């Protein structure tokens, strides 16, 4: 099966009450871990590449890695998506370079300018058979080159979504309902403490999501910054020389609730980084004599695979939906 767009994928997800996992990729082991889990669970998947990943690994290397995944996992639909395209030129480069989906993120611009930039990308993308994700509202946090301070973040305004989608022609819309980028999604003072002494973050703004869905019936919604920051991997990192105090993510039950509504794409990046980093730190700490990268990248890949499997089955609900 060749690379596909997300159009049919999202239509099935919307009707079926599940979401597609959009996992950020940076190297071979991450691509392998994700796609092997999806192949075994018969789940559709979006492999997404940020501007930072393209700078790190090179556009051509990443495309070829994804093409290899397509060849090795022929039974599942795979989308190659640009995450947080900052401008028309970056989106055009990815469209011309084999991507089947791009995101134009002009959410920091004034509303009218966001429409103008997004529409330009949509027109070029649709002429080339590529779909476009846009964004309204701004998430706090840090992801590669996307840096937004908490005081600059803003929830999506539901009263703007109909005009935005109508004027831009975008195929899906990322909204801001309380998620944020990175492993430090919430400050301790924003959280409550449960009976086990664990910090519990504030709930997502499902009222905003439901109002957006009411105004855009049948339209696919996207959640960015949706890593749950598994505490076992945070502990693994901290136990083996790392320093990640108060790393807090989005509770998985809230993501499952969002997937049952109109959210068709859920972005996950930090969880993969935590799994890989924790595994490698533990291996290095326990085996100080080892120096073969294959020896520590192999268990890192295996843990990424199991993490993704858990997301597909227990969080996204997309296992068996390929």
Stretches with model-predicted labels:
Residues 20, 104, 294-297:
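Active-site oxyanion-binding pockets that recognize sulfate/phosphate
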Residues 223-228:
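Short catalytic/ligand-gating loop segments at beta-alpha or beta-beta junctions
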